[in-house]
């Protein structure tokens, strides 16, 4: 039986540390941040959902379904995940943020292989030093558990998944994979990392 996997790109936050700018639409290397994430994740999944709570018309121009949180109170990544789980019929949902332009090209395969081998409910990515809670492969059937957690006033993703049978997938071989953008300095760091990756590809 073929396993189906959809992805949701989370672009629904308020981006306070970026001065309120919509992070998914911030330009990086001549294209919006979310376009980098789309290019990385699209070959790895069946369908893409974009979770956005503003600029929905702009996001729709990327050619994928745009979904907004069912609660308009900017309740964080969990709210976006809950919404996405109600919009997918796939066996698994791959969750990624809009501001990680160097996501691994083998992200889904590695996480799925480890998840199924361990017979776990979800897999969380790690850069080898820390877990990345918003880079997660999970079963949509976990929606009820996540919604109950959020409805109870909880927000921390790692507190939620600690209640479940989860595994951590190590991507320490790709140290730049989960660099994201919260400050102008991090944006510069990412630009340099992207340039280095392009140079390495040319040398191969």
Swiss-Prot record:
Major localization class: cytoplasm
Molecular function in Gene Ontology: GTP binding; metal ion binding; molybdenum cofactor guanylyltransferase activity
Subcellular location: Cytoplasm
Positions contributing to Mg(2+) binding: 99
HAMAP family, per database record: MobA
One Gene Ontology CC term in the entry: cytoplasm
Biological role: Transfers a GMP moiety from GTP to Mo-molybdopterin (Mo-MPT) cofactor (Moco or molybdenum cofactor) to form Mo-molybdopterin guanine dinucleotide (Mo-MGD) cofactor.
Protein name in the entry: Molybdenum cofactor guanylyltransferase
Gene that specifies this protein: mobA
Catalysed reactions listed for this entry: Mo-molybdopterin + GTP + H(+) = Mo-molybdopterin guanine dinucleotide + diphosphate
Family, as annotated: Belongs to the MobA family.
Keyword annotations: Cytoplasm, GTP-binding, Magnesium, Metal-binding, Molybdenum cofactor biosynthesis, Nucleotide-binding, Transferase
Oligomer status and interactors: Monomer.
Pfam families registered for this protein in UniProt: NTP_transf_3 (PF12804)
Cofactor: Mg(2+)
GO term, biological process aspect, one: bis(molybdopterin guanine dinucleotide)molybdenum biosynthetic process
Entry note about domains: The N-terminal domain determines nucleotide recognition and specific binding, while the C-terminal domain determines the specific binding to the target protein.
UniProt EC number: 2.7.7.77
Organism per entry: Shewanella piezotolerans (strain WP3 / JCM 13877)
Ligand binding (GTP): 10-12, 23, 51, 69, 99
This protein's record includes keyword Transferase: yes
């Amino acid at each position: 039986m073929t396993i189906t996997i959809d992805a949701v790109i989370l672009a629904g936050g308020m981006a306070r540390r970026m001065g309120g700018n919509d992070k998914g639409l911030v330009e990086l290397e001549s294209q919006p941040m979310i376009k980098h994430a789309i290019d990385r994740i699209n070959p790895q999944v069946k369908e893409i959902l974009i979770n956005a709570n503003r600029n929905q018309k702009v996001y729709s121009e990327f050619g994928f379904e745009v979904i907004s949180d069912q609660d308009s109170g900017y309740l964080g990544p969990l709210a976006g995940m809950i919404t996405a789980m109600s919009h997918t019929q796939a066996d698994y949902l791959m969750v990624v943020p809009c501001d990680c332009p160097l996501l691994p090209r083998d992200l889904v395969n590695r996480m799925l292989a480890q998840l199924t081998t361990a017979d776990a409910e979800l897999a969380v990515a790690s850069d080898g030093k820390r877990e990345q809670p918003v880079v997660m492969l999970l079963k949509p059937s976990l929606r009820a558990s996540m919604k109950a957690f959020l409805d109870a006033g909880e927000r921390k993703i790692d507190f939620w998944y600690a209640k479940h049978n989860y595994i951590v997938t190590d991507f320490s071989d790709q140290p730049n994979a989960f660099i994201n953008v919260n400050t102008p300095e991090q944006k510069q760091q990412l630009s340099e990392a992207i340039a280095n990756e392009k140079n390495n590809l040319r040398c191969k």
